[in-house]
Amino acid sequence: MLKLNLQFFASKKGVGSTKNGRDSQSKRLGAKRADGQTVSAGSILYRQRGTKIHPGMNVGRGGDDTLFATATGVVRFERLGRDKKQVSVYPA
């Protein structure tokens, strides 16, 4: 009598898991209006975390540190001393 000896081998190697492959959604921070641009009151000028840029004349700061125009006018990004920056809105 014939004895069959069948052996099956794995066609694919066992695949391990990876610890990569995740990323958070971008928060779209940064300047929303350019220097010299005309804005109306309430327009968002700069979205930021912390006070990278400080509010100047006719600019308010929101709870999440967003800078917005409190009056209609022209946007100006300015230096405050050696290491600070501010954004102001001057009436047109």
Curated annotation (Swiss-Prot):
GO cellular component: cytosolic large ribosomal subunit
Superkingdom of the organism of origin: Bacteria
This protein's name: Large ribosomal subunit protein bL27
Pfam family of the protein (one): Ribosomal_L27
Spans annotated as Disordered: 14-34
Keywords: Ribonucleoprotein, Ribosomal protein
Gene that produces this protein: rpmA
Family the entry assigns: Belongs to the bacterial ribosomal protein bL27 family.
Single Gene Ontology MF annotation: structural constituent of ribosome
